[in-house]
Amino acid sequence: VPTLFTGISRVGDGEIFARGIPIEGLVGELTFVEMLYFQLQARMPEAHESQMLEAYLVSLCEHGVTSPSTHGARVASSVRAPFGASAMGFIAGAMGEFHFGALERAMRDLQQLNELGISAEEFVEHRLEEGQRIWGYGHRFHRSEPGPPPSATVQEDRDPRVRALLALADELEWRGEHLRRVREIGRALHERKGVPINIDGVAAGLLLDMGFRPEIALLFVVLGRLPNIARLHQEEQSETPNRFTGLATRNDPTFDRVVDREIEQSMGGEQ
């Protein structure tokens, strides 16, 4: 019989070990954020790391109802699907690189910048010349106008989550290299395009500074967003069931006629 092995946990009759430590030695002793570090990095976070990761997760807990990932969740909830189905709709709608995938892309951008060994200004110029997106910057709601310093500082002040996290980073005297580069890119990009830092850009710098790897970036976004999805699911239960069908019943006569004509021609009808 095939056997699965792991070097980080053991479960037996009456015992559970996580990285060699009995689970009862962790329950009541570690916070959830500390357990994340313990599981993913086999270490306890420094006080400033724990405070910052906690703050980041809190910042994700409210996105309103305009975010694409909330749509699938809310539609599922409206037909009285269980919360698990709504949560899966939320996660499925979030998987694309232009939504939750943006955090991982932003983290990989920062890694590439470090590998290239060029300045933030050179990185921005290269990406713009190539017509490539710089992940972690720009937002459909939180905008600013282009301009040279000191107006470039505005690009850190548009998104309230960015504003709060960077203020906390300054208060904690954050010395991480990746967050520093995020802010440098932000200033350079703002001067050229008036594009501000967004929450993914700040998070990319912070998470890399804290030692987390890009391939698990989705973990943090899902952890932070699920409470919001649960609240939306509960709210939808008080609405009229299946109320979103109205969005799907508007006929497009032009489209229908085109399709009908193509079908008619393919069947040898009038030309």
Question: Locations of the language-model features?
Answer:
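Non-transmembrane, aqueous-exposed alpha-helical and coiled segments at domain scale
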Residues: 1-271
